[in-house]
Each structure stands twice: as C-alpha cells, then as structure tokens.
Amino acid sequence: MTSAVGTSGTAITSRVHSLNRPNMVSVGTIVWLSSELMFFAGLFAFYFSARAQAGGNWPPPPTELNLYQAVPVTLVLIASSFTCQMGVFAAERGDIFGLRRWYVITFLMGLFFVLGQAYEYRNLMSHGTSIPSSAYGSVFYLATGFHGLHVTGGLIAFIFLLVRTGMSKFTPAQATASIVVSYYWHFVDIVWIALFTVIYFIR
C-alpha cells in the first residue's frame, strides 16, 4: 500500500513538473499582461503630463501624502510576491496543502494593501483632495484606483483558486492556474513599486 501511495504521489509530481514547459495558457497570460503594461504606461504618461502642466508645488496644497502609512502597506504587498511564489513552488511539487497555505497568506496580505489604500483615500478626501478638486487629484485617483482594481481582481482570482482546489482533487490544470495567477500578482506588485516611487518620491 505504501508503494502504491508513493507511486501515485510521484505520478502527480511528475505531471505537475511538466508544467515547467511553456504552454498556451502561460503564453497567453504573458501577452495579456504586456497589453496591461501598455495601459499603465499610458497612465504614467498622463501623470507626468499633468505634473508638467501644473507647475509649482506637486502635490498642490492642501494635499499631503502620508509616506509613513504608505511604506508599510507597500512592504506588505512586496512581501506578498514572495509568499505567492512559495505557493507556486508548492504547486510544482504537487503539494496542495502548501499551495493553499501560501495563497491564503498572500490573499490576506493583498487585502491588507487594499484596505490601506482605502484608508488613505478616506484621509485625502477628508482634507479636500478629490477627483474634481485638482489635476493632481484626478491623476492620483486614476492611477492608484486602476491599480487597486487590478489588486482586487487578483484577490478574486485567489479566492477562485482556493475554492477550486478545495472542491476537487489537485490536478496539473489547477497547478497551471496557480502559476498563471502568480504571473498576474507579480505584475501588479511591480506596477505598484513604480507607482509608489513616482507618486511619493518624484515630485
């Protein structure tokens, strides 16, 4: 019986390891993320254009960004890329429990980021910074808002994957899905690092 279990586990691991080869799902995801990159490049261009036209102080009064709040939230999001990758490694080993554990942690870290961003929005709006208040308000909420929507989309993907892996036997298709979700999550993390640098340090 032990031999049968070992053989079964080896077979699953072997099938999962075959996912290291390029497949159409992964390639399609990379192509789609490339188009998303162009979208965010447009947002960056819009931001710098608004900055050049505004002149003077940027952000304009009364807007004051809270760097001490933004840094911890950003660090948590960056760390979530590492926990996400640990989940991928578990999936490649055929370790469903490891995958779920690391992806739950990643989900919670992503949720923390979204809640932190919502809290910052609340503070800025309470001090008069809104979309119609200034050009800065428009580009700030547009850029960070679209990124926040992408993070939320990633959280939904994590929920879908966790439910899917909990309702059926772990398969190579599910491992592929976990890898695709990780591509997306790493993408939104990298975009945020760029946004964070531009918004909080390049003025």
Swiss-Prot record:
Protein name: Probable cytochrome c oxidase subunit 3
Catalytic activity as recorded in UniProt: 4 Fe(II)-[cytochrome c] + O2 + 8 H(+)(in) = 4 Fe(III)-[cytochrome c] + 2 H2O + 4 H(+)(out)
Membrane topology (UniProt): Multi-pass membrane protein
GO biological process: aerobic electron transport chain; aerobic respiration
InterPro entries: Cyt_c/ubiquinol_Oxase_su3, Cyt_c_oxidase-like_su3, Cyt_c_oxidase_su3-like_sf, Cyt_c_oxidase_su3_a-hlx
Phylogenetic classification of the source organism: Bacteria, Bacillati, Actinomycetota, Actinomycetes, Mycobacteriales
Sequence similarity: Belongs to the cytochrome c oxidase subunit 3 family.
UniProtKB keywords: Acetylation, Cell membrane, Membrane, Translocase, Transmembrane, Transmembrane helix
Molecular function in Gene Ontology: cytochrome-c oxidase activity
E.C. code: 7.1.1.9
Keyword field contains Amino-acid biosynthesis: no
Gene3D superfamilies cross-referenced by the UniProt entry: Cytochrome c oxidase, subunit III, four-helix bundle (1.20.120.80)
Gene name as annotated: ctaE
Pfam hit, one: COX3
N-acetylthreonine: residues bearing it: T2
